[in-house]
UniProtKB/Swiss-Prot annotation:
Main location: cytoplasm
Quaternary context: Component of the Mediator complex, which is composed of MED1, MED4, MED6, MED7, MED8, MED9, MED10, MED11, MED12, MED13, MED13L, MED14, MED15, MED16, MED17, MED18, MED19, MED20, MED21, MED22, MED23, MED24, MED25, MED26, MED27, MED29, MED30, MED31, CCNC, CDK8 and CDC2L6/CDK11. The MED12, MED13, CCNC and CDK8 subunits form a distinct module termed the CDK8 module. Mediator containing the CDK8 module is less active than Mediator lacking this module in supporting transcriptional activation.
Gene: Med15
Disulfide bond positions: none
Lineage, broadest ranks: Eukaryota, Metazoa, Chordata, Craniata, Vertebrata
This protein's name: Mediator of RNA polymerase II transcription subunit 15
Length: 789
């Protein structure tokens, strides 16, 4: 076969039409719609190909592309076949992604290549024919007959390269998938470990909380058990006291009638100093004598005598009236001696001064049964033994009784007991103040408890011992209940309902342990704090008006809402009397106002007036006026207007340098000189960095204009101005630079500017403009800067 005939045969229309029909058949089987027809694709391939082999290889690849689409319809992302052809013309790239061929196994036949084999046989791969069908098109015989062995080898090599590259891509993708799976497994393991650690920590915290709750429950149960035991002990002791009181009543009822007649003479002796109270009030008066010293001595918590350490300090209200009334009678014989001995034993530890003791006070009900009151009125002479008996019973039972006293004149000024840091009243009792317990004299101070309003109820303090009662009010001063050495009758405020009480001197000397005037009472301290508060408020009143002005000023400013709220709260504290705040808060407000003082422009108070002395300065009134007006905005103007005329009258006009007068010109010369319009227009169009003015020192009648040019450029240094002489027939003649070399001899930089300017002027053409001359000047300065750098 003639090779030249084959080379020219592929360009014929019949040959090309066969390939067009084959491409059309492949497109129809693939079922893919394209914007370009098979004829367009073939013509594109025909234009790209240079030889027959290249033309056949491109058509074969196009057919293979469509048949792969037919075999792999599941793949939707198929690239444009025309783009694939364009990428194939330059040779297969690594990866062969531009061809758009899906991967095939090594045993699968090339469907589109079957039409190019000799006699319709499929192309053998690896030397062995594959078991698949040939896949030849029915009208592809003409193409087969024209194929050469070289084309077959090229197509086989291309297919093998594509398969190898696709296999490598598959392996790489598999490796990446395996790596991603390993990373996901590691992340899952880490998350599981973190979750387990969090669960363990939460379990430990929950166990700790449960243990704490169990411990608290156990402590509460133990506390309740203790309370129950103590209440049982109190009930037992109260029953014993009631039995003793009943025995004493039975013994005393037999002796009441005989002793009533004998008790009248000793009771009439002190009646000259003190009126005898009615019989119905005898027993409460006896009780009040007992309760005087015990009211001064608050019971300590841990320093009580060994007899009363483990005894409960409370008595229920329902069991108070009967034992106290019944114990007001006397004990006969040996019981009286025993009571006195025990009373001395109880009194000994009570002498010690005990600071900071919480008073555990129990109220005593003054209600007396009618029968017991009548019996007590008939046995008035048994006051002292009855007092000793009650003291003995109180010491054995650990009870601390506080009677209801009417307010005396010493209490009207407020309680004067000294207050410790913890708010607990502290009282000091000397041994002499306790002699009223043992002295049987009936002339002691007597006060009736009937008309006194009840004291505040004791409230148990949480967190302390369960049986300790703390009075809600401060303990009364000891001096208000002790008889004074100089007796003065003190009238009770409730004299309408109670008989008058007179203070009678005690037989034994008494030393008052506490001076009420030396201890600052709560009422006095609060009065001092009130005075300090009012003084501080008066001191801060100067900030009210500036603060209001500041609030009105920034009221509409959205950025300072926080400052506005602070200022309004400060103004409320200063102006609203209902909003009372502690003194410390007021001091903090003062600090805040001091910080805002500059913003508010608080008027400074005038300086304190200077006391007139004999050597007072003559100009002191003037200095005072200056100090008063020194903050005025027109202060300098006022000083100038006031003092300059006087200073000029004294010293004369100020000395100034003489003004350099320029050469005067006549008006006729000014009228003759005019600037040409050409020059005016050029100057108006100059760069703004050039400032051009007329030279006032030159004036010529021949039409020449002298200009002074200054350079105002932020990127260039300051240099002497440029002087130009523009002729009258400008622009027919060029302007001239008036060289003043002495201005450039100041430093090396200016000398460099002068040299550059001279050299550049020589390069200008014969006819040049003012603009060209000024640009040359600026370039010379720039060149000098570069050379200096």
């Amino acid at each position: 076969m003639d090779v030249s005939g084959q080379e020219t045969d592929w360009r014929s229309a019949a040959f090309r039409q066969k390939l067009v029909s084959q491409i059309e058949d492949a497109m129809r089987k693939a079922g893919v719609a394209h914007s370009k027809s098979s004829k367009d694709m073939e013509s594109h391939v025909f234009l790209k190909a240079k030889t027959r082999d290249e033309y056949l290889s491109l058509v074969a690849r196009l057919i293979i592309h469509f048949r792969d689409i037919h075999n792999k319809k599941s793949q939707a992302s198929v690239s444009d076949p025309m783009n694939a052809l364009q990428s194939l013309t330059g040779g297969p790239t690594p990866g062969a992604a531009g061809i758009g061929m899906p991967p095939r196994g090594p045993g699968q036949s090339l469907g589109g290549m079957g039409g190019l084999g000799a006699m319709g046989q499929p192309l053998p791969l690896s030397g062995q024919p594959p078991p698949g069908t040939s896949g030849m098109a029915p009208h592809g015989m003409a193409v087969v007959s024209t194929a050469t062995p070289q084309t077959q080898l090229q197509l086989q090599q291309v297919a093998l390269q594509q398969q190898q590259q696709q296999q490598q891509q598959q392996q790489f993708q598999q490796q990446q998938a395996a790596l991603q799976q390993q990373q996901q497994q590691q992340q899952q393991q880490q998350q599981q470990q973190q979750f387990q650690a969090q669960q363990n920590a939460m379990q430990q915290q929950f166990q700790a909380v449960v243990q704490q709750q169990q411990l608290q429950q156990q402590q509460q149960q133990q506390h309740l058990i203790k309370l129950h035991h103590q209440s049982q002990q109190q009930q037992i002791q109260q029953q014993q006291l009631q039995r003793m009181a009943q025995l004493q009543l039975q013994q005393q009822q037999q002796q009441q009638q005989q002793q009533a007649l004998q008790a009248q003479p000793p009771m009439q002796q002190p009646s000259m100093q003190q009126p005898q109270p009615p019989p119905s009030q005898a027993l409460p008066q006896q009780l009040s004598q007992l309760h005087h010293p015990q009211h001064h001595q608050p019971p300590p918590q841990a320093q009580q005598s060994p007899i009363a350490q483990n005894q409960p300090p409370q008595i229920p209200p329902q069991s108070q009236s009967q034992p106290l009334v019944s114990q007001a009678q006397a004990l006969p014989g040996p019981m009286l001696y025993a009571a006195q001995q025990q009373l001395k034993f109880v009194r000994a530890p009570m002498v010690v001064q005990q600071p900071q003791v919480q008073p555990q006070v129990q109220q005593v009900q003054p209600q007396v049964q009618p029968q017991a009151a009548v019996q007590a009125a008939q046995s008035a002479q048994m006051v002292a033994p009855g007092v000793q008996m009650i003291a003995e019973a109180l010491a054995q039972g650990g009870m601390h009784v506080r009677a209801r006293f009417p307010p005396t004149s010493t209490m009207s000024a407020g309680p004067s007991s000294s207050i410790s840091l913890g708010g607990q009243p502290t009282t000091q009792v000397s041994q002499s103040s306790l002699t009223m317990l043992s002295s049987p004299s009936p002339g002691q101070q007597v006060q009736t408890p009937q008309s006194m309003p009840p004291p505040p109820q004791p409230s148990p303090q949480p967190g302390s011992q369960p049986n300790s009662n703390v009075s809600s009010g401060p303990a009364p001063s000891p001096s208000s209940f002790l008889p004074s050495p100089s007796p003065q009758p003190s009238q009770s405020p409730v004299t309408a309902r109670t008989p008058q009480n007179f203070s009678v001197p005690s037989p034994g000397p008494l030393n008052t342990p506490v001076n009420p005037s030396s201890v600052m009472s709560p009422a006095g301290s609060s009065q001092a704090e009130e005075q300090q508060y009012l003084d501080k408020l008066k001191q801060l009143s100067k900030y009210i008006e500036p603060l209001r002005r500041m609030i009105n000023k920034i009221d509409k400013n959205e950025d300072r809402k926080k400052d506005l709220s602070k200022m309004k709260s400060l103004l409320d504290i200063l102006t609203d009397p209902s909003k009372r705040c502690p003194l410390k808060t007021l001091q903090k407000c003062e600090i805040a106002l001091e910080k805002l003082k500059n913003d508010m422009a608080v008027p400074t108070p005038p300086p304190p007036p200077v006391l007139p002395t004999k050597q007072q300065d003559l100009c002191q009134p003037l200095l005072d006026a200056v100090l008063a007006n020194i903050r005025s905005p027109v202060f300098n103007h006022s000083l100038y207007r006031t003092f300059v005329p006087a200073m000029m009258a004294i010293h004369g006009p100020p000395i100034v340098s003489p003004v350099v007068c320029s050469r005067k010109r006549r008006f006729e010369e000014d009228e003759r000189q005019s600037i040409p319009n050409v020059l005016q227009g050029e100057v108006a169009r100059l760069d703004p960095k050039f400032l051009v003015n007329l030279d006032p020192s030159h004036c010529s009648n021949n039409g020449t204009v002298h200009l002074i040019c200054k350079l105002d450029d932020k990127d260039l240094p300051s240099v002497p101005p440029l002087e130009l002489s523009v002729p009258a027939d400008y622009p027919a003649q060029s302007p001239m630079w008036i060289d003043r070399q002495w201005q450039y001899d100041a430093n090396p930089f200016l000398q460099s500017v002068h040299r550059c300017m001279t050299s550049r002027l020589l390069q200008l053409p014969d006819k040049h403009s003012v603009t060209a001359l000024l640009n040359t000047w600026a370039q010379s300065i720039h060149q000098a800067c570069l050379s200096a750098a």
